[in-house]
Curated annotation (Swiss-Prot):
Assembly notes: Monomer.
Function: Is required not only for elongation of protein synthesis but also for the initiation of all mRNA translation through initiator tRNA(fMet) aminoacylation.
Organism annotation: Agrobacterium fabrum (strain C58 / ATCC 33970) (Agrobacterium tumefaciens (strain C58))
EC class: ligase
Protein name: Methionine--tRNA ligase
Amino acid sequence: MTDKTPFYITTAISYPNGKPHIGHAYELIATDAMARFQRLDGMDVFFLTGTDEHGQKMQQTARAEGISPEELAQRNSDQFREMGKLLNASNDDFIRTTEERHHETSRNIWNLMADSGDIYKDSYAGWYSVRDEAYYAEDETEVRADGVRYGPQGTPVEWVEEESYFFKLSEYQEKLLKLYEENPDFIGPAERRNEIISFVKSGLKDLSISRTTFDWGIKVPDDPKHVMYVWVDALTNYITATGYIEDRNGPRAKYWPADVHIIGKDIIRFHAVYWPAFLMSAKLPLPKRVYAHGFLLNKGEKMSKSLGNVVDPANLVAHFGLDPVRYFFMREVSFGQDGSYSEEGIATRINADLANGIGNLASRSLSMIVKNCDGQIPTPGAFNDDDKAMLASADGLLAVCREEMGKQLIHRALAAIIAVVSETDRYFASQEPWALKKTDPERMGTVLYVTAEVVRQIGILLQPFMPQSCEKLLDLVAAPADGRDFTALGEAGRLAPGTPLEAPKPVFPRYVAPEA
């Protein structure tokens, strides 16, 4: 096997009580870009996504449709798997919480927490949101004008009283605060970290971790009338897929603990409070980082079925093409903040950055090479200061992208790449290679060489975001098949003079809105 460094990244597992929407697609695209980046950078990556199929909400949705929860889970989980294929996600596994491997790990982690003395039986009475699968304190709820009591996410809550097992979360307050203090990067971005620290400082109550009022879930060991609270089961998926609890020497055990869990900001509490507490109790290693992205807004409004503005990712991809959609969401939205998008915004971004930017640069420079340099990469003369500065900008991109991607700041990595595209445009325009053709053909060759070399490096670095388009872009500059990972960046992989090129075909066509 490989001696590469393991890197384990996950999305949240999606709740399949409905069809996948653009919010699910956004998280999967972003996590896929991060996974691909690390693979190209020489890491041994394991990338996990999947579906979270238990809980009261699934049971209620299935009943409303007149089918069993199993049928609903199978049908909708398949739709999430299909979405992954549509988006060209490179996940190494797709986990379903209804799988036997997951039931086994969930029972194992429960028993480890019980062995630590952290689980006891009592009765629960309190406010519960079926939609959030979450319990809320009285002061987190409010009765609105319609007479209904709502939780902090704006979902209705109901009063629940039943026998329940509890986890001694109250005993983990100081341990969690110490974790956040000693590992400032455990939670990102900073707003979420501050939110969690303030929540934990305000005091933690023991957590109800089983239910008896429904049966669609994983049975509690030795007490089958109880099913596990869906979040005990759901969070455990991340460790299930590695087999770490069952066999520390198993083929995937090396991936635990996870390098980063990518999640939505609405589920930060489960991942940054409950999950590390469960793992501490089970005496298992903690993930290194939990990073919460924001919500996608449609023209500034939150998407909801009632507003009728929920976007199906398949429609967006059919309309604009896959890679342009992937690129838009990674470039336009600051990862970690809420972001707004519109079809006009996508069109503008495609045309500015892709068609007029990298596409135009590649097409102009490579067409000139094919036409004026016998259809092959020219041999450059001595590099002047402009050439050296241009190459240095391209050569320096990997370090910048590594740093930004390491902090999940995908939008900043892309902004840095596009800044170099703009710089190359200015370089190309100011050097006027078309005018040099008659006056100084060797200098023309040098300018074209430098430009093509920057296009090559841009093509390699954009692969995590637009894999299919960048494959075509790298074909245009005849980058060898084994010279497309990050070891080929910089001087190590410079274009070889004399390499034959074919006339470039457009990789990023302009988007023209269809006639109404």
